[in-house]
C-alpha cells in the first residue's frame, strides 16, 4: 500500500511568550483535523510553542487538499490564540490566504511517500527555537559517521551509501550528493548549517528514508519573525537506520542557531513529548515521536527521549548552555552579522555605527603578492 506521511508544524501562539500553546488552541486544531475525511490517521502535539500535525493519507506529497487542511487548522488555532490574547498569535502564518501549498507560507513541512512495509517504523523529530540546519549534525552522524552509527558498517544497504539532497537556503537551489563519492563535499556543505541544510535522504536505488523542513522564515518575511523550528521524518529499521541509531544521533547536544530572539548559539536539548520551551534563556529543544504504522494507521507515539539515560544528556545540554551564555553577546555566543541583520534592532545599531565610520588614509597597495597556500 502506497502511503504518504505529512508532518506540518507552525507557531500560532504561546502562553505568556514563546512557551507552549494553550489547551484551547490545541483543541481547535484537533477539532479541525478530526473533522476531515481526507486522512487515514493523524496525531497532534507540540514542541515548545510549535504545534505539529502528523498525518497519513494516500494523496502524495505537496497535495493541496492536505496542505489546506493543515493551514485551516492553524488558522483555527490562531483564532483561539487571538481570543485568549496569546503571544505571537498566527506568527508563522506569513500569508493572508492559502495558495495551494503551505511551503513558503510559514509552516514547516516534512513529507515522505513510500510503499508501506509490513512493519513500518518511523520517527518524527520536532524542534523548537532553532533553524533547519540544526538537523545537519544528527543527519551526518546517522548516514555518514560510522563512529556514531555502526549500522553504516554492518548493514548492507547503509554501507553502500545513501543519496543526501542538500539545499542552499540562501539561493533556493539543491544539490544531489552521493555517498561515498561526495563525502568531502557533503562535509564542506554541512559546515555552515545557516545556509546549507539536508532536505531529504534516500537509498542509492531511490527508496525515501528522510525528509526535513527547510524554509527560513526571514527569507519569506524579509525580517525576523521567529526561528524556523524545523521538523523531520526518518524511516527506521531494516535497510534504514535502526530507531536507536537514529535517536542516539541526538545524544551529543551540539550548538545550533536560535534561542531567545533567534540570535544566539546554544545546545540542542532532547526533551520529552509535549515539553514547553524553557524560560532559562530558551534553550533549543527537540522531541522524538516514534511511530509504528500499518495500512496508514498509527500506533504511538512512543516518547523517544523519555528514558532515564536522556536525563544525563539534558544535564550536558544545560551545562553547555550556561557556559555559552556566560560569554554574553560576544561571538560565537551570538550569531554572525549576516544572520543578525534580519533583526531590526541590530540593523539600526549597525546603521549608527556605519554613519560614524570614516575611511583610513591610503596606506599603500593591499596584499603581499604571495600566491595562495593551503593553511597549515
Swiss-Prot record:
The active site is at residues 11, 224, 227. Its cofactor is Mg(2+). One of its GO terms (molecular function) is oxidoreductase activity. Changing residue 224 to F: Shows slightly decreased FBP phosphatase activity, whereas FBP aldolase activity is nearly completely abolished. Mg(2+) 4 binds at residue 228. It holds the Pfam family FBPase_3. Mg(2+) 2 binds at residues 49-50, 128, 229. Keywords: Carbohydrate metabolism, Gluconeogenesis, Hydrolase, Lyase, Magnesium, Metal-binding, Oxidoreductase, Schiff base. The keyword Metal-binding applies. Homooctamer; dimer of tetramers. This is Fructose-1,6-bisphosphate aldolase/phosphatase. It comes from Cenarchaeum symbiosum (strain A). The lineage of its organism: Archaea, Nitrososphaerota, Candidatus Cenarchaeales, Candidatus Cenarchaeaceae, Candidatus Cenarchaeum.
Amino acid at each position: 500500500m502506497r502511503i504518504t506521511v505529512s508532518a506540518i508544524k507552525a507557531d500560532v501562539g504561546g502562553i505568556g511568550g514563546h512557551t507552549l500553546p494553550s489547551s484551547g488552541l490545541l483543541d481547535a486544531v484537533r477539532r479541525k483535523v478530526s473533522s476531515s475525511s481526507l486522512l487515514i490517521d493523524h496525531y497532534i502535539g507540540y514542541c515548545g510553542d510549535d504545534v505539529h500535525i502528523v498525518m497519513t493519507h494516500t494523496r502524495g506529497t505537496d497535495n493541496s487538499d492536505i496542505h489546506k487542511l493543515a493551514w485551516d487548522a492553524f488558522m483555527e488555532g490562531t483564532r483561539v490564540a487571538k481570543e485568549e490574547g496569546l503571544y505571537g498569535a498566527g506568527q508563522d502564518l506569513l500569508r493572508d490566504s492559502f495558495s495551494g501549498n503551505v511551503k513558503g507560507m510559514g509552516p514547516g513541512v516534512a513529507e515522505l511517500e513510500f510503499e508501506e512495509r509490513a512493519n513500518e517504523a518511523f520517527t518524527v523529530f520536532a524542534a523548537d527555537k532553532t533553524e533547519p540546519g540544526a538537523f545537519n549534525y544528527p543527519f551526518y552522524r546517522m548516514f555518514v559517521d560510522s563512529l556514531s552509527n555502526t549500522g553504516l558498517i554492518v548493514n548492507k544497504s547503509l554501507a553502500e551509501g545513501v543519496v543526501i539532497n542538500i539545499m542552499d537556503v540562501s539561493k533556493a537551489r539543491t544539490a544531489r550528493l552521493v555517498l561515498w563519492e561526495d563525502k568531502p563535499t557533503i562535509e564542506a556543505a554541512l559546515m555552515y548549517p545557516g545556509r546549507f541544510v539536508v532536505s531529504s535522504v534516500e537509498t542509492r536505488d531511490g527508496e525515501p528514508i528522510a525528509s526535513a523542513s527547510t524554509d527560513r522564515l526571514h527569507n519569506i518575511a524579509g525580517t525576523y519573525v521567529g526561528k524556523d523550528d524545523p521538523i523531520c521524518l526518518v524511516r527506521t529499521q531494516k535497510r534504514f537506520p535502526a530507531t536507536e541509531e537514529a535517536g542516539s544521533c541526538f545524544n551529543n547536544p551540539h550548538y545550533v542557531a536560535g534561542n531567545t530572539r533567534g540570535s544566539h548559539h546554544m545546545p540542542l536539548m532532547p526533551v520529552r513529548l509535549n515539553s514547553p520551551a524553557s524560560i532559562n534563556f530558551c534553550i533549543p529543544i527537540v522531541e522524538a515521536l516514534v511511530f509504528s504504522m500499518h495500512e496508514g494507521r498509527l500506533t504511538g507515539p512512543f516518547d523517544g527521549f523519555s528514558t532515564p539515560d536522556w536525563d544525563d544528556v539534558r544535564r550536558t545540554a544545560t551545562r553547555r548552555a550556561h557556559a555559552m551564555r556566560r560569554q554574553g553577546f560576544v561571538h560565537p555566543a551570538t550569531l554572525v552579522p549576516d544572520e543578525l541583520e534580519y533583526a531590526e534592532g541590530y540593523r539600526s545599531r549597525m546603521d549608527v555605527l556605519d554613519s560614524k565610520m570614516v575611511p583610513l588614509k591610503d596606506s599603500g597597495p593591499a596584499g603581499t603578492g604571495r600566491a595562495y597556500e593551503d593553511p597549515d
